[in-house]
Amino acid sequence: DRSGSVETVYKRVSDCMERSLNGKALDSNSREIKAMIAYIKWVGHGVEKDSVPKGSGIKPPEYLDRAASPEKGLAVYTAKCQSCHGANGEGLMAADAKSYTYPPLWGEHSYNNGAGLFRLSRFAGYVRDNMPFNQASHKNPALTDEESWDVAAFVNSRPRPSKDLSKDWPNISKKPIDHPFGPYTDGFTEQQHKFGPFKPIIEARKKQQESKGKVAMVNKKNVKVS
């Protein structure tokens, strides 16, 4: 939906390189990209088209009745994230000085504003099920839902690289509720789409869909009558 087209595996991997890693797409004939594509196809072997394998994806925490708070998130970050990711979100470089033991969460070496993690639900869901490292799992989270939303708000309010997103979401009605860049079809602000509260947006979109469904039924009846 983001690109408005059917995407190849190469396109999906390239998006990860350019957005989540804030890097460049690999040459389509490179050894590395061929290896990644082969691995992805192997993992997906036997999975039926349009099905969702059990345990895949990121499930957002329970939506809050308030906006996620960067201020409260700072306290969570300081207490539970800073020891690995650094006071300034710089991460921890590995001994080889070529990679990171703990990745940077903001700044020039972090993911850019086009990455999936820049959406609060993606970040909050990921940290709720996985962080702090070696202390949490999806069955035994170490962070509460509130802490997950708030620390996501804090990290995603910090400076990071920007990507040209002008061609994203050609059908704006399909933008996720937490996509933080307008325009939108629902009348809510960019601020609310970024930090919430998200429940009013969900309810408004539900009503939009119900209204569209009623219009479609009326049109269908009119066609039959004519």
Task: Indicate residue ranges for each PLM-predicted region.
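Extracytoplasmic electron-transfer domains, predominantly the class I c-type cytochrome c fold
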Residues: D1-L26, M36, Y100-S162
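N-terminal export/targeting leaders of redox proteins
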Residues: R2-S14, E18-I37, K41-H45, P161-S226
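Acidic/His-rich structured neighborhood in mature extracellular/periplasmic domains
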Residues: E7, A35-A38, G57-P61, A79
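The canonical Cys-X-X-Cys-His
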Residues: M36, G73-L92, L105, V151-V155
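Electrostatic cytochrome c docking/interface patches
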Residues: H45-T78, L92-M93
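Conserved helix-loop functional segments at active or binding sites
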Residues: K49, G86, E90, F133
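Short, charged hinge/linker segments at domain and secondary-structure junctions
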Residues: V52-G55, T101, W169-S173
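Short cysteine/histidine-rich zinc-coordinating motifs and their immediately flanking basic loops
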Residues: A94-S99
